[in-house]
């Protein structure tokens, strides 16, 4: 309790509205955030998720918790529970920081303001820096967790590519002064992943109604946020609107580098969205035919027998 109280006082003492330019040295804190997620997950796995998983999956049924099949079910539940905790916390944090900003509802303010600031010469608030460190720390941790901790699924390569691209996107968008855009990208991604992980946990817990509802919300949010809002609002702004404000004489060298590198990463993310949507759509059609919409998506039918962490 003493450590938590001290941390609370430290956070309360920070002026989160203070503005500063993004800098490479800010990422010196990244290893601390990665270790933070490692420790928190270990504690939740041992003292919270294990107990909840046993209760929801098996109820009062007497089972041997040391059997490999039993451990496999609990392990998958704990993975989804952990991801749900992160995505929900990340969504709440992103929305709390961005919701009242003008660029949350009008993409042109990604590039102008406050005052006479124009991209890329824009400062950001410390609270936005915190959102970035939180997300970058999680995905850095996730790369190692995917290799050494979590169940190896059949889309391991795609998931690893996603994590690496996400870390690169977060770091580069920060140092290239795209943090405003990045915070909204984080928010629209975390939202659909919350529904996905809730649906998985419901499926593992044999709660078919909740699994069906969560899966349908996941599909709807994926289409609206990742396949509609992301390309037609976010990518339009990063590829077109930004050029309307860029001082090409002042930034004739660094401006194009920032522009092409960041947009290349964003479009690669869109390619992954489309790839996963093809998988989701195929599974949705199959599940509608079998009248069982709650089955898992994005490769939960993993090759676990080939590799177990």
Swiss-Prot record:
PROSITE patterns (UniProt xref): TLC
InterPro entries listed in its UniProt record: Lag1/Lac1-like, TLC-dom
Record-level GO cellular component terms: endoplasmic reticulum; endoplasmic reticulum membrane
Swiss-Prot/TrEMBL keywords: Endoplasmic reticulum, Lipid biosynthesis, Lipid metabolism, Membrane, Transmembrane, Transmembrane helix
Organism in which the protein naturally occurs: Oryza sativa subsp. japonica
SMART domains per record: TLC
GO BP annotations, alphabetical order: ceramide biosynthetic process
UniProt name for this protein: ASC1-like protein 1
Lineage of producing organism: Eukaryota, Viridiplantae, Streptophyta, Embryophyta, Tracheophyta
Entry membrane topology: Multi-pass membrane protein
Annotated compartments: Endoplasmic reticulum membrane
TM stretches of this protein: 27-47, 84-104, 130-150, 156-176, 215-235, 260-280
Function: Mediates resistance to sphinganine-analog mycotoxins (SAMs) by restoring the sphingolipid biosynthesis. Could salvage the transport of GPI-anchored proteins from the endoplasmic reticulum to the Golgi apparatus in ceramides-depleted cells after SAM exposure.
Coiled coil location: none
GO molecular function, one term: sphingosine N-acyltransferase activity
TLC domain: residues covered: 75-289
Entry annotated with the keyword Lipid biosynthesis: yes
């Amino acid at each position: 309790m003493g450590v938590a109280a001290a941390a609370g006082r430290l956070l309360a003492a920070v002026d989160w509205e203070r503005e500063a330019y993004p800098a490479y040295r800010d990422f010196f804190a990244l290893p601390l955030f990665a270790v933070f997620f490692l420790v928190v997950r270990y504690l939740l796995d041992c003292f919270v998720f294990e107990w909840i998983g046993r209760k929801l999956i098996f109820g009062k049924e007497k089972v041997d918790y040391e059997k490999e099949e039993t451990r496999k079910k609990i392990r998958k539940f704990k993975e989804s529970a952990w991801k749900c905790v992160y995505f929900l916390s990340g969504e709440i944090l992103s929305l709390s920081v961005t919701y009242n900003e003008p660029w949350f509802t009008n993409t042109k303010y990604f590039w102008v303001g406050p005052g006479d600031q124009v991209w890329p010469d824009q400062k950001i608030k410390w609270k936005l820096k915190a959102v970035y460190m939180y997300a970058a720390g999680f995905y850095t941790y996730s790369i190692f967790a995917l290799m050494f901790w979590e169940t190896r699924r059949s889309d391991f390569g795609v998931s690893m590519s996603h994590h690496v691209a996400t870390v690169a996107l977060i770091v580069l968008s920060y140092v290239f002064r795209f943090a405003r855009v990045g915070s909204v990208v984080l928010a629209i991604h975390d939202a659909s992943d919350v529904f996905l992980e809730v649906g998985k946990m419901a499926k593992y817990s044999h709660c078919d109604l909740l699994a069906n509802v969560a899966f349908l919300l996941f599909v709807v949010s994926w289409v609206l946020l990742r396949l509609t809002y992301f390309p037609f609002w976010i990518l339009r702004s990063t590829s077109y609107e930004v050029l309307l404000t860029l001082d090409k004489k002042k930034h004739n060298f660094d401006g194009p580098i920032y522009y092409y590198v960041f947009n290349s990463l964003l479009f690669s993310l869109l390619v992954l969205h489309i790839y996963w949507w093809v998988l989701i759509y195929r599974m949705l059609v199959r599940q509608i035919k079998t009248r069982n919409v709650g089955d898992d998506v994005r490769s939960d039918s993993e090759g676990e027998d080939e590799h177990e962490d």
